[in-house]
Each structure stands twice: as structure tokens, then as C-alpha cells.
Amino acid sequence: MSWELALKTVLRVAEPLFAGDEPPCAVIGSVASALQGCQLAPRDLDLLAARPEEVVRFAELMWAYAPAQVEHPTGHADWLSSEEQPLSIGPDDYGFVWHFGRWLVDGVKVEMAHIAAPEGFPMSADGAGIWEAGPEIWPHLRHVLFAGLRVPVVPLEIQIQTSMSRGLEERTAQITAVLQQSSCDRDLVQKALSKAHRKAFDALIDGPAD
């Protein structure tokens, strides 16, 4: 069971959705962090689509990994895609509209989503930072090499906002350490971070490297 095997499978099965300079799908979450040098052990593979249509297409390509039927549990965390119900579509309790699928690939949960925020959701221009699963990531995608392939990922400069807002101290430290050792895009960081997190990040990034 490894995220590397799951990612290789996804890139083979759904290669057109991740190819080119402006792909319609990208890797986010802990796997994106690991691909960019963070010392993490991802337990699942999170994927994001620019439009709902790409989630539908991904589900079609993943047909071999969808059982005919699944006895769906009441808890969303254990829901799996099936031939009968390949996607879960609809609003959550906070007004975000999801197109979502989840498959088990080589023992790893692979999740693909498009998430439409409710009207009035704050954006970077409002000082709220860039939401890692939102529409503002697409102009900033970065490509990394993995198994001889160019893989589109959300940059660490955007992921740091998610990590800090969720209070993930270990991941924040990992991302900061990589950014200290690489060519950190400070302009993107300033746009990606909410006003509440900018000062704290500046103190971290300008501190001693591990």
C-alpha cells in the first residue's frame, strides 16, 4: 500500500486530465507536499478538477476501480464510488457544492473533487488568502517530475495557508523548511496567505533553516 503506486496508476489511467501546460486537474493535499520535497507519509491521494466535467470524466476513466455496488455507510468518510453511484453531487452543510468521487487504488483512497464555494466566499483580493481547493490555484500550478512524468501540483506557497489555517504545525514546519531551501515565490506567498497569517509566516521563513 503506497501513495506512489496509487499516483502512478492514476496518471496511467487518466493521463489526459493531468497532461499539458494547463491541465484541468491537479494533485493537492499531502501528496502534493511530498512531491515538492516535504518529508511526509501521505495516507491518501487528493485530486482537484477545474470544472465538474473533469470529475465526471475521471469517474468514467476509473471504471475498473469501481465495484458494481457499495453498501454506502452513513459517514461520508467511508463512502466509495461504484458503478451504481460513481459520484456524490450536492451541497454540504456550509453551502459548498461538491462533485466528488472516491476509489481504492492499491489500498490507497483516491479522491477527486470539484468544489464550488458559496456566493460571497472571501478570496485573496479580500485578504482571505488562496483556498487550496478553490479556483484561484489554477494560474499558479507547478509541475514536478515523478516516475518520468510531469505532474501538476498546487505550490507549497499556497499550501502553507491551508496548513497554518488548520493548525498543522508539523506540516507547516515541513513546508517552511522546503521553502527556505528553494526559490520561494514571496509574492505568491503574500497573495496566498491571509492577513492573519502573513506576519507569523514571515517570522518562520526568515528564521534559521533546519
Locate the predicted segments by residue.
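Compositionally biased terminal segments of proteins
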Residues: 1-210
